[in-house]
């Protein structure tokens, strides 16, 4: 299988190629089209993605027309990043008449964690996280080589946006946490999920995991026509109004005061 994967869900722009059972990838930090003084402007996803795809295909000696499918990180995540990934994947898919595979960003985090039972929490801003929980059973000898083991993936609870104190608590021991939500809301999530066996806040969405999950989904017949693919936003609001911002600050102050009083 030849499968191209791309992910612009969060701050890192990444692409990967699954070619004859071997995964190769490259990534770069991306900004959102703004610069933060005094450092230089960070290139945006839209500036980075196509050159990275061209460079990876050239490095691997694979023409775009050789691809069987294109997978992309569909969300949840940065609304702008999701639209860029979906738009680029659609453009490429339509150009070469290949299907797309939309991969949930939280499932890619759970896969990247390497754990069998993982709760993925991605900082959603506005006092919330995107979260979901998965059971993943990996086994050797998958059809796409050692970089993509055969796997069954059970969604224990579906992706959602919620406050850290409202994250569903999975039943049973052995669960691990992954994602930057565990650093952005460390105290609240530790209180909500005290029984987690471990936490890795460094795990983030990325094209390598998107490629692996995309290959599994493609084999299962879950690819769609490029024109039908769409991001999965989970929520439809990107900013708080002034009253909501004030309420969020007040709530944070109350939590800090309560924490200090214990």
Predicted regions and their residues:
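Flexible, glycine/charged-enriched surface loops at secondary-structure junctions
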Residues: 223-227
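Phosphate-handling active-site elements
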Residues: 58-65, 93-103
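Stable alpha-helical structural segments in soluble proteins, enriched in small hydrophobic residues
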Residues: 56-60, 95, 113, 210-218
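Amphipathic, membrane-active segments
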Residues: 243, 250-251, 256
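Surface "functional belts" at beta-alpha junctions
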Residues: 22, 28-44, 99-205, 219, ...
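DPxDG-like acidic metal-binding loop motif
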Residues: 71-99
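N-terminal beta-alpha supersecondary unit
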Residues: 1-74, 204, 259-262
């Amino acid at each position: 299988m030849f499968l191209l994967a791309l992910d612009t869900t969060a701050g890192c722009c990444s692409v990967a190629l699954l070619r004859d059972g071997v995964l190769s990838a490259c990534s770069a930090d991306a900004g959102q089209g703004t610069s933060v003084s005094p450092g230089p402007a960070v290139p945006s996803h839209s500036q980075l993605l196509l050159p990275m795809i061209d460079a990876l295909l050239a490095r691997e000696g694979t023409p775009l027309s050789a691809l069987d499918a294109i997978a992309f990180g569909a969300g949840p995540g940065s609304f702008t990043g999701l639209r860029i990934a979906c738009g680029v994947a659609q453009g490429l898919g339509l150009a070469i008449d290949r299907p797309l595979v939309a991969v949930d960003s939280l499932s890619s985090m759970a896969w990247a964690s390497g754990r069998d039972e993982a709760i993925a929490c991605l900082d959603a801003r506005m006092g919330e996280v995107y979260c979901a929980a998965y059971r993943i059973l990996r086994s050797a000898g998958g059809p796409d080589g050692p970089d993509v083991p055969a796997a069954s993936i059970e969604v224990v609870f579906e992706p959602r946006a919620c406050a850290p104190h409202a994250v569903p608590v999975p039943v049973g021991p052995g669960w691990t946490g992954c994602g930057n939500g565990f650093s952005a809301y460390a105290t609240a999530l530790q209180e909500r999920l005290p029984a987690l066996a471990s936490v890795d806040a460094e795990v983030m969405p990325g094209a390598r995991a998107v490629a692996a999950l995309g290959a599994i989904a493609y084999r299962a017949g879950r690819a769609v026509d490029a024109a039908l693919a769409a991001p999965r936003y989970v929520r439809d609001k990107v900013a708080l109004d002034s009253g909501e911002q004030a309420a969020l600050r007040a709530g944070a102050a109350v939590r800090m005061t309560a924490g200090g009083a214990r």
